[in-house]
């Protein structure tokens, strides 16, 4: 008899039960499995890594052999598959002990296992991606106030380095690098939107922290220079450029990108930034109001309504 195709409405995979829907899966920081605000015990690092691997491929079947390779890499023990199954049983028991029907979440399905998550709000990664994509779309259309709300919401999901308690596993390192790129993109676009809305003063401290953590990330330096300049701190903008230039020269032997050098020369000559800021101040910034309000028409009280999380 052929295998029944997976369907979210199939009884063994239904996640509409109140208890199952209350489970939260978090990877943007140490791995967490929460039930109504209570962290559930996840066991040894290898057992947590099995859950992490399933969570990164949520709603898809992960082969047992793929789990073995991810956990033990090049030197799995002879009974590795049996050990993986033991980890799965332990995780199911943890869910069951918390009052959750584990059959609705952790499913055995050839050639391995599937972690079922029926609601995107149950996973911090899904919430981050959804808010990020909405923010980038709003930013591309020039709706910068709307972009700020989405991008700030995306960053609220982060608690620390991706799967920070499992960084010794190669699959975590690879995933973390890719996702960190997304996080930095969100920070960059959030700074751009805030500067467009006249809130450079709010993002400058955050940008300073970010360039200290990511000294080669020229897109962050660009926003920092622009933020200082439009906030009438020309000397600080010039200093930021020289800090970047020294870092790149001493550690990589390269010059800043042409766009960064062009921005620096405009700052030296005290030229207007119409190509970088004027373009956005002509755009609408509030989708919800529907009145096409421009940035220059925002009052100071309007600007104060922008997310304080920017700081």
Swiss-Prot record:
Biological process terms in GO annotation: molybdopterin cofactor biosynthetic process; phosphorelay signal transduction system; regulation of DNA-templated transcription
SUPFAM superfamilies given in the database record: C-terminal effector domain of the bipartite response regulators, TPR-like
Outcome of mutating residue 181 to Q: Shows reduced transcription of the moa1 locus
Role summary: Acts as a positive transcriptional regulator of the molybdopterin biosynthesis moa1 locus, promoting the expression of the moaA1B1C1D1 genes. Binds directly to the moaA1 promoter.
Induction record: Expression of MoaR1 appears to be modulated by oxygen availability since it is up-regulated in both microaerophilic (NRP1) and anaerobic (NRP2) cultures compared with aerobic cultures; thus, seems to be up-regulated during the shift into the persistent state in the human host.
Gene Ontology molecular function: any one: DNA binding
Mitochondrion recorded as keyword: no
Effect recorded for residue 112 to A: Has no deleterious effect on the transcription of the moa1 locus
Protein name, as recorded: Transcriptional regulatory protein MoaR1
Organism phylogeny: Bacteria, Bacillati, Actinomycetota, Actinomycetes, Mycobacteriales
UniProt-listed Pfam families: BTAD (PF03704), Trans_reg_C (PF00486)
């Amino acid at each position: 008899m052929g295998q029944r195709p997976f369907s979210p409405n199939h009884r063994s995979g239904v996640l509409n039960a109140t208890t199952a829907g209350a489970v939260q899966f978090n990877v943007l920081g140490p791995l967490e499995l929460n039930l109504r605000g209570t962290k559930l015990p996840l066991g040894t690092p290898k057992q947590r890594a099995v859950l992490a691997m399933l969570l990164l491929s949520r709603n898809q079947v992960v082969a047992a052999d793929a789990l073995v390779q991810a956990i033990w890499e090049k030197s799995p023990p002879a009974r590795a598959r049996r050990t993986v199954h033991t980890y799965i049983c332990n995780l199911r028991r943890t869910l069951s002990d918390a009052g959750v029907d584990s059959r609705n979440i952790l499913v055995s399905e050839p050639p391995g296992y599937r972690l079922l998550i029926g609601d995107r709000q149950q996973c911090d990664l899904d919430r981050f991606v959804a808010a990020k994509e909405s923010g980038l779309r709003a930013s591309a259309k020039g709706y910068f106030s709307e972009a700020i709300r989405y991008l700030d919401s995306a960053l609220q999901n982060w608690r620390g380095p991706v799967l920070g308690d499992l960084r010794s596993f190669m699959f975590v390192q690879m995933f973390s690098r890719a996702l960190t790129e997304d996080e930095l993109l969100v920070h960059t676009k959030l700074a751009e939107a805030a500067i467009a809305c006249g809130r450079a003063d709010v993002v400058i401290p955050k940008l300073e922290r970010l360039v200290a953590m990511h000294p080669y990330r020229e897109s962050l330096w660009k926003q920092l220079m622009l933020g200082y300049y439009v906030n009438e701190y020309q000397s600080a903008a010039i200093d930021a450029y020289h800090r970047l230039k020294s870092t790149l020269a001493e550690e990589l032997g390269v010059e800043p990108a042409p766009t960064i050098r062009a921005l620096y020369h405009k700052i030296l000559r005290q030229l207007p930034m119409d190509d970088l800021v004027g373009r956005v101040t002509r755009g609408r910034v509030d989708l919800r109001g529907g009145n096409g309000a421009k940035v220059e028409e925002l009052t100071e009280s309007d600007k104060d309504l922008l997310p304080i999380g920017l700081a």
